[in-house]
Amino acid sequence: MVCEGKRLASCPCFFLLTAKFYWILTMMQRTHSQEYAHSIRVDGDIILGGLFPVHAKGERGVPCGELKKEKGIHRLEAMLYAIDQINKDPDLLSNITLGVRILDTCSRDTYALEQSLTFVQALIEKDASDVKCANGDPPIFTKPDKISGVIGAAASSVSIMVANILRLFKIPQISYASTAPELSDNTRYDFFSRVVPPDSYQAQAMVDIVTALGWNYVSTLASEGNYGESGVEAFTQISREIGGVCIAQSQKIPREPRPGEFEKIIKRLLETPNARAVIMFANEDDIRRILEAAKKLNQSGHFLWIGSDSWGSKIAPVYQQEEIAEGAVTILPKRASIDGFDRYFRSRTLANNRRNVWFAEFWEENFGCKLGSHGKRNSHIKKCTGLERIARDSSYEQEGKVQFVIDAVYSMAYALHNMHKERCPGYIGLCPRMVTIDGKELLGYIRAVNFNGSAGTPVTFNENGDAPGRYDIFQYQINNKSTEYKIIGHWTNQLHLKVEDMQWANREHTHPASVCSLPCKPGERKKTVKGVPCCWHCERCEGYNYQVDELSCELCPLDQRPNINRTGCQRIPIIKLEWHSPWAVVPVFIAILGIIATTFVIVTFVRYNDTPIVRASGRELSYVLLTGIFLCYSITFLMIAAPDTIICSFRRIFLGLGMCFSYAALLTKTNRIHRIFEQGKKSVTAPKFISPASQLVITFSLISVQLLGVFVWFVVDPPHTIIDYGEQRTLDPENARGVLKCDISDLSLICSLGYSILLMVTCTVYAIKTRGVPETFNEAKPIGFTMYTTCIIWLAFIPIFFGTAQSAEKMYIQTTTLTVSMSLSASVSLGMLYMPKVYIIIFHPEQNVQKRKRSFKAVVTAATMQSKLIQKGNDRPNGEVKSELCESLETNTSSTKTTYISYSNHSI
């Protein structure tokens, strides 16, 4: 009958439903058979909707095309199977029967939108007061099924279209195959959930694979459309966020490619030859044609394909392209074959499966026969007997999404079960509170479900309604002319990849590279190319720098140097002057000889202490001088010994003390001679402080100044050891060494020796002043020669010591120079002042006798005559004065102090 509608009551999407108003009314006026001609209806207490691509897209003007046996029939039968299992389960929705209303989307989003309006009919309030039929009777409306939730759809484009309608009526939707990332937008698709992971997870898995294989320079290839472009976009975004992967170029395959288009794409990919890895989000046909083009251009083994789930483990894309596809890594959502469904589906016949309105069509397609009035009218097709059996008389393999269809139905069932437990506690069947199910409330229960699915894996949803990502990773391998997709790993929020099981072209197990630049060697940093972070030049970390990370070098701490590969720092070896070193052997040898000689002289002097020569040399000051000489030799051992606090303390004390002893004694001697002869020129009165006791007091007073300075040094800067890393910090870190030494700077050393050098210089001045003393009284001349030689030694010491401050051998040179200089100074004093005396004492004892006893008056007379004859002496060689000067002196027997004079070795 014909009816004219004037008004439709208000609803949440009035502006949208107005356009469909007449279509809905037409649908509602159909007879029962007409209404369900393209749907499956199973009655129940709670009705679930289902959307499946039973047919493919039709040609222009025709909404539906050929039957899709696997993606259509297998999947909708999986929903019916799940409904049967739930209704038989006494522990799940007990005494509540689930019914279904399954529609065909015909793989077209617009057609699916029209079909899905059936699900919202019961939620649209109708005002029929102004609606009249042609005969004036009120219209009769068929009561539509009230849909509580929808299972589907398959294609993302269909799910997007349907989700926009269902959300307006608050009908929860669970998809079993839609993977578009945009469906994760909970603000736009808040009532949409899915038991399959979104392509963003797949993209994440592919990024992880690329990273695990060390590929940082890749190209992307997408089929034009939502699936390909969204997948590549997700891959690009994730790779940009985590860093480390650069996109060399992104190519798109047009929906309607021109001839030669695929060859052009391959040539463009070859423009960046280092980007061998190609990320593919493309449909099956595009994958096949890309492989054909690569084969045509003879690029076997060059490209490293990373395929999405549209490639998966399919044979069709690689058929007759095996060599070009070898090594391809593909990804596929983890799934399992459900044995219970296999038994169920194989048992389906025309007799026991009348609820499936498309099963007769499937039967004809599957067995290649015709069914009477429903059969195909082609005469050459055999007639169906009805005795055919699935898997026996036809090939059968469970479709890959069957598991997810079952899990989607069970997710809805568990949500309803939990809702019933809370809203109808203890109530058998539906309670009044669940007669009308609040879709928003049901959505909350759906998002909260957590159960083991049909394959034994957990089924859960996140806050966006997405299922966790679980993927199997395959590699296409060729072994002994046989091919296979071998599982090489899996991905469940993180990658587990068996790299050792991977095989590449030419049966190699070492995975090839897809990088813009080769990795830098250890100890080299990356200097990235501007704008291309995956391309770089390698620069070596020089000097004492080590590689901190890929991009930077840093200076090692002062006490460390780079290790052999410059990836870290290691302690610099600590060295000290060893006893066996040539730098130590020479000064030690000299010191030992000097100590032996000094000891021999001391023993000789002690043994012959009362002989004229020993007495005439000034015994008291001689022993002080010999002590200083002994200390000068001994300091060598302290300077070479391993430094510690005690050794450093002794070094400070004895470093200048030996020289101070020596030169204080010599200075006192030369000063005494000078004062005596100067006084003798003026008067016959003896100068003050020329007695032995006075001489000792003067000497030790001079020495005490040195000791006082050392004491102040101890207080201001207590002795301790240091490790000097700057002394031997060579240009080559391998030769760098830390020097263990006492904390005595060059300045401190000069200050310590400075006082002794001052005494030495003063003594030299007095030696020069007394150089003209008559030979009878002249011990001043040997002292003078001693001081001249000593000055030369120390003048040579200064440039050698300070000129090696920047040398890597500084410690050795300075220590050896200092110890040898002190030993040579001591040797000069010992050799010139005491060896002649010892020689006479040992080998010429007849000369070690008292010749004359002279008074100070004799000295005065000698001094006076010496001053008178000095000018005459200037006319003689070397200013010598005749020895008869001494013979004219008369003996004075007064009580004044006398001096013993040896004509061979005079001393005062």
UniProtKB/Swiss-Prot annotation:
This is Metabotropic glutamate receptor 8. Glycans are attached at residues 95, 298, 452, 480, 565. L-glutamate binds at residues 156, 177-179, 227, 309, 401. GO terms for molecular function: G protein-coupled receptor activity; glutamate receptor activity; group III metabotropic glutamate receptor activity. There is a cross-link at residue 882 (Glycyl lysine isopeptide (Lys-Gly) (interchain with G-Cter in SUMO1)). Interacts with PICK1. It is a multi-pass membrane protein. Keywords: Cell membrane, Disulfide bond, G-protein coupled receptor, Glycoprotein, Isopeptide bond, Membrane, Receptor, Sensory transduction, Signal, Transducer, Transmembrane, Transmembrane helix, Ubl conjugation. Residues 1-33 form the signal peptide. Residues 609-620, 669-695, 769-781, 844-908 are cytoplasmic. The keyword Transmembrane helix applies. Prominent expression in olfactory bulb, pontine gray, lateral reticular nucleus of the thalamus, and piriform cortex. Less abundant expression incerebral cortex, hippocampus, cerebellum, and mammillary body. It is found in: Cell membrane. Residues 34-583, 642-647, 717-746, 804-818 are extracellular. Belongs to the G-protein coupled receptor 3 family. GO terms for cellular component: GABA-ergic synapse; glutamatergic synapse; neuronal cell body; plasma membrane; postsynaptic membrane; presynaptic active zone membrane; presynaptic membrane. The keyword Glycoprotein applies. Disulfide bonds join 64-106, 246-534, 369-384, 424-431, 516-535, 520-538, 541-553, 556-569. The chain crosses the membrane at residues 584-608, 621-641, 648-668, 696-716, 747-768, 782-803, 819-843. One of its GO terms (biological process) is adenylate cyclase-inhibiting G protein-coupled receptor signaling pathway. InterPro entries: ANF_lig-bd_rcpt (IPR001828), GPCR_3 (IPR000337), GPCR_3_9-Cys_dom (IPR011500), GPCR_3_9-Cys_sf (IPR038550), GPCR_3_C (IPR017978), GPCR_3_CS (IPR017979), GPCR_3_mGluR8 (IPR000144), GPCR_3_mtglu_rcpt (IPR000162). It comes from Rattus norvegicus.
